[in-house]
């Protein structure tokens, strides 16, 4: 039964990392396209991008903590 739990922990962190990586890539692509189109707004775009990337990374870290908590309960 513990094997299923380890698979669940692996899936939890793996899917969180996958989702976060895809989201960060899409957000970065959009920000770079926006900076290329409007260079005068690059400061505002960069600030917004960094804030969004921090939130996305925080969700990944939260899922890592949850995965560790799940692992210790096995």
From Swiss-Prot:
Its placement in the membrane is given as: Multi-pass membrane protein
UniProt xrefs under PROSITE patterns? ATPASE_C (PS00605)
Q: Which SUPFAM superfamilies match?
A: F1F0 ATP synthase subunit C (SSF81333)
Instruction: Give yes or no: UniProt keyword Ion transport.
Output: yes
UniProt-listed Gene3D superfamilies: F1F0 ATP synthase subunit C
Offer one Pfam family short name for this entry.
ATP-synt_C
Transmembrane regions: 2-22, 49-69
| Coiled-coil spans in chain | none
Keywords in alphabetical order, please. Answer: ATP synthesis, Cell membrane, CF(0), Hydrogen ion transport, Ion transport, Lipid-binding, Membrane, Transmembrane, Transmembrane helix, Transport
Identify the GO cellular component terms for this protein.
plasma membrane; proton-transporting ATP synthase complex; proton-transporting two-sector ATPase complex, proton-transporting domain
| Subunit relationships | F-type ATPases have 2 components, F(1) - the catalytic core - and F(0) - the membrane proton channel. F(1) has five subunits: alpha(3), beta(3), gamma(1), delta(1), epsilon(1). F(0) has three main subunits: a(1), b(2) and c(10-14). The alpha and beta chains form an alternating ring which encloses part of the gamma chain. F(1) is attached to F(0) by a central stalk formed by the gamma and epsilon chains, while a peripheral stalk is formed by the delta and b chains.
Q: What is the documented function of this protein?
A: F(1)F(0) ATP synthase produces ATP from ADP in the presence of a proton or sodium gradient. F-type ATPases consist of two structural domains, F(1) containing the extramembraneous catalytic core and F(0) containing the membrane proton channel, linked together by a central stalk and a peripheral stalk. During catalysis, ATP synthesis in the catalytic domain of F(1) is coupled via a rotary mechanism of the central stalk subunits to proton translocation.
Which family does the record assign?
Answer: Belongs to the ATPase C chain family.
Record protein name field: ATP synthase subunit c
Q: What is the lineage of its organism?
A: Bacteria, Bacillati, Bacillota, Clostridia, Moorellales
Q: Which gene encodes it?
A: atpE
């Amino acid at each position: 039964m513990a094997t299923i739990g380890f698979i669940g922990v692996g899936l939890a962190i793996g899917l969180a990392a996958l989702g976060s990586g895809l989201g960060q890539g899409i957000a970065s692509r959009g920000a770079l396209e926006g900076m290329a189109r409007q260079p005068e707004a690059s400061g505002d775009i960069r600030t917004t991008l960094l804030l969004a990337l921090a939130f996305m990374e925080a969700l990944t870290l939260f899922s890592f903590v949850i995965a560790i908590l799940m692992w210790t309960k096995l």
